[in-house]
Amino acid sequence: MASTSIMLSSFFSFFFLTFFVTYAQQNVTVHTICYYDGGNFTSNTSYSLNLNRLISSLPDLTPTINGFYNISINGEVNAIALCRGDVKPNQDCISCITTAAKQLVESCPNIIEANIWLEKCMFRYTSRIILGQMEPVPFSYTSSNVSVTDKEGFSKGLGDLLDSLGAKIDAANETKEVKFAAGVKGTIYALAQCTPDLSESDCRICLAQIFAGVPTCCDGKTGGWWTNPSCYFRFEVYPFFDLSVTSEQKQPLSSHNNNTRRSDQGKSKDRSKTLIFAVVPIVAIILGLVFLFIYLKRRRKKKTLKENAENEFESTDSLHFDFETIRVATDDFSLTNKIGEGGFGVVYKGHLPDGLEIAVKRLSIHSGQGNAEFKTEVLLMTKLQHKNLVKLFGFSIKESERLLVYEFIPNTSLDRFLFDPIKQKQLDWEKRYNIIVGVSRGLLYLHEGSEFPIIHRDLKSSNVLLDEQMLPKISDFGMARQFDFDNTQAVTRRVVGTYGYMAPEYAMHGRFSVKTDVYSFGVLVLEIITGKRNSGLGLGEGTDLPTFAWQNWIEGTSMELIDPVLLQTHDKKESMQCLEIALSCVQENPTKRPTMDSVVSMLSSDSESRQLPKPSQPGFFRRSASFSISLNDVSLTDLSAR
């Protein structure tokens, strides 16, 4: 299924493991991605007919020397297929590609763009031109459940093997027929591969990004793999590829061989060099002028946008607090007044001269929130007025100091109650239900009730504050994005937020919309119902909360999900309805998730009259305890810890 990678765990014997790999590995799905945000097609349309034609033509492909295929039907459907470098480019290769294509269209019905990696081949199709395009995202990586005994020695061996693979890939790049390398270091077996249509530099960049991420993906583990549309890497502690290819690998040419080649080629090559030296400077000058024009045009546009933003920010001068006033109000930011801390800074309680209690967020100089995020939070919050959103009183700027001044919420954040074994008893079912309803109404206001749609992008329990009646207020808008009503989705290369709450299409592809907030809301509701953190302890190894809840729901053991603290106070029908709403919100396909308008409507209706669609599997769904997917548990350097 989409966004799901599978990793073989350890078996009881080497013989059984080897048998399974050699017999079944070709048809094991490593990674499938359905680009839901890329659009759909309907049956009997031109795209549908051409895609079917392309799929049906695959068994008749003619074997190529490198197992790579670029296929296009009427320029409307474009596909790329590639067999692993150790697979003979014969009918076995074509059979794997055909199987992959059939699995892909079944997994991603009516989706315009999708890709799949099987053990021995990959296949992708789309409506756009992809030949020769290096695309390191979307990516997926998976690690073994088994840890190595000698982590330091294993890491050194793997590092040496990565260096060796890189050198072999560079040598393979010279042929431009196959960009593949495999190697063995002690008991570690590894391979790496790029699609042959990539340039030498693009292949090197693609694999360099993968190699740099290996410690994050698989540190101390006995195996792991990483796939993206353009390249692939895998390592194990058992032979999973044809070992004969390691002896056939082309090594970097020595200087002696290079000199011999130059002598053999003679004067014809010298003439070619003369021509190249004459043409290259002219082409470089032309390209330089083109790039300079584009750069100046973009800079002028950015300058205009920046000036507009600065003018809008200056219009908030009435909300500006004197820095000394805030410093005195917090007793010089005394530790005794500290009420919270996050990745962006520390929050203090304070009292203004008129007696008004305030909460002051003092942004850290080294925090992930820069001036842009600070201004975003100020500009957005000044436009928002809703009882379930925290109220911004103002801000203060002095040199490198940046302060945000909010209304003081006495009970701090939801997570401090929900996951505290003592305080959680204060949250009976009625209070938890009111929190769910309040957060849903706050999100609905952001998505549909404010001047422009706003996507929060970092909804989680620590960003939900509780007032004196334990009613919720959504806070922290530094990562929020504002849209116009005609365009409520976007793609970003900088993924920010908290991983366990991120929708799969956002975490893996950078695509976000109002449905990414819906996913985060679903995770939050599951935490409120169960009293458990997502990816927390007590769920079983390698299991996140949506998977844990889904498994109980399909097995008919949903009541086991209810926080034991609630057993005497919860309304069974109401809690089960909330569970189904949450599971609907964390579905893998964003188009199947309800809108917040639908969620509020379902929560506001009588429990007997609610019509809930049957939810499908959640994003990052883990099919078995025998398999592990590391995506929910990893922190990326691009993420801002909050």
UniProtKB/Swiss-Prot annotation:
Residues carrying sugar: 27, 40, 44, 70, 145, 173, 258
Residues modified as Phosphothreonine: 498
Positions where Phosphotyrosine occurs in the chain: 406, 506
Residue positions binding ATP: 339-347, 361
Keywords noted in UniProt: ATP-binding, Glycoprotein, Kinase, Membrane, Nucleotide-binding, Phosphoprotein, Receptor, Repeat, Serine/threonine-protein kinase, Signal, Transferase, Transmembrane, Transmembrane helix
Residues the record lists as Phosphoserine modifications: 462
Residues of the Gnk2-homologous domain: 29-130, 136-240
Active-site positions on this chain: 458 (proton acceptor)
Chain ranges of the Protein kinase domain: 333-620
EC number(s) from the headed UniProt entry: 2.7.11.-
InterPro entries listed in its UniProt record: GNK2, GNK2_sf, Kinase-like_dom_sf, Prot_kinase_dom, Protein_kinase_ATP_BS, Ser-Thr/Tyr_kinase_cat_dom, Ser/Thr_kinase_AS
Cytoplasmic compartment segments: 296-642
Chief subcellular location: membrane
Record flagged with keyword Ligase: no
Residue ranges of the TM segments: 275-295
Membrane-related topology note: Single-pass membrane protein
Signal peptide stretch: 1-24
Compartmental location: Membrane
Protein name listed in UniProt: Cysteine-rich receptor-like protein kinase 27
Species of origin: Arabidopsis thaliana
Lineage of origin: Eukaryota, Viridiplantae, Streptophyta, Embryophyta, Tracheophyta
